[in-house]
């Protein structure tokens, strides 16, 4: 079970503390060659695995995948984990950890299956919990795509690269956490709105983004 960290009115679910730093650690490795985000590929990597990558993938992510013997191909079928996997894991943990209904659950759009699974579990007890997915307003970042295929009931909030960078710096300064840009943006949104933020993706994989800014 990953811990909560309170930040103002927000509760941060620290999925970046999982063994490979991502909420994708919670799902089994696909049995076929599929297309994944960089953090998904790092979580599901095994020796000899082959993946295609989608979205923004940093130098550090590529280097780690090479170190673990992962082969990267240009194209494969898109893949999204089953939300019910997250309902049974992430959602069950949230129900155990929360004593009252959160106003919302927010996470980057790349973790949309986790968001849907969490809502599936939480709404059995608290039907009015709002779901929020963050998408990129300008330059796509790891786990922060420009669009998503989530249901219309999920609110989409656009986050710019500069806003994500400020959120990352603030989370590091105030909480001592080295979070990803997308995870920090989710934390900052929940800090202003209340609710639960899913903070996934360790920040050490994204220093090259700051060097390129």
Predicted regions and their residues:
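PLP-dependent amino-acid enzyme catalytic core
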Residues: 1-213
């Amino acid at each position: 079970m990953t811990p909560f960290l309170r930040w103002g009115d927000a509760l941060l679910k620290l999925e970046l503390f999982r063994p490979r730093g991502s909420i994708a650690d919670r799902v089994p490795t696909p049995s076929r060659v599929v297309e994944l985000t960089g953090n998904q590929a790092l979580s599901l990597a095994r020796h000899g695995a082959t993946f295609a990558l989608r979205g923004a993938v940093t130098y550090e992510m590529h280097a780690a995948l090479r170190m673990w013997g992962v082969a990267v191909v240009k194209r494969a079928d898109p893949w999204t984990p089953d939300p019910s996997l997250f309902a049974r894991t992430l959602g069950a943990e949230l129900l155990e950890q929360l004593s009252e209904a959160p106003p919302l659950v927010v996470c980057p759009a790349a973790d949309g299956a986790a968001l849907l699974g969490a809502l599936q579990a939480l709404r059995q007890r608290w039907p009015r919990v709002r779901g929020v997915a963050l998408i990129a307003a300008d330059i796509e970042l790891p786990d922060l795509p420009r669009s998503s295929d989530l249901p219309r009931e999920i609110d989409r909030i656009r986050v710019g690269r500069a806003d994500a960078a400020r959120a990352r710096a603030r989370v590091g300064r105030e909480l001592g956490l080295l979070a990803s840009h997308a995870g920090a943006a989710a934390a900052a949104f929940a800090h202003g709105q209340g609710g639960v933020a899913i903070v996934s993706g360790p920040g050490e994989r994204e220093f090259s983004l700051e060097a390129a800014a």
